[in-house]
Amino acid sequence: MIPGEVITPETDIELNVGRETLKVVVANLGDRPIQVGSHFHFYEANDALQFDREAVKGFRLNIAAGTAIRFEPGQSREVELVALAGKREVYGFAGRVMGKLD
């Protein structure tokens, strides 16, 4: 092994296997691009994004860690979300939950 070397399996690595997911259509009604990161509580995303907020409470984007999705002004697209795991407590972000989800 070489210091810093990363050895990965030859097969694809599946993310969030067995976790609850849902698909939602999101529209950017604003006049500026909006980017949402992989671990942002989607329910608390920018108010210029239009979607069923109650349906996505407790979910985040189902994309690789450290990545994001950009919504251009006037753009509408379908995204897949995955349920938050662990204690299912949310603090910070836009301050709309500040506690337990369930």
Curated annotation (Swiss-Prot):
This is Urease subunit beta. It catalyses: urea + 2 H2O + H(+) = hydrogencarbonate + 2 NH4(+). GO terms for biological process: urea catabolic process. PANTHER family: UREASE. Keywords: Cytoplasm, Hydrolase. It comes from the Bacteria. The gene is ureB. Heterotrimer of UreA (gamma), UreB (beta) and UreC (alpha) subunits. Three heterotrimers associate to form the active enzyme. Its EC number is 3.5.1.5. The lineage of its organism: Bacteria, Pseudomonadati, Pseudomonadota, Gammaproteobacteria, Moraxellales.
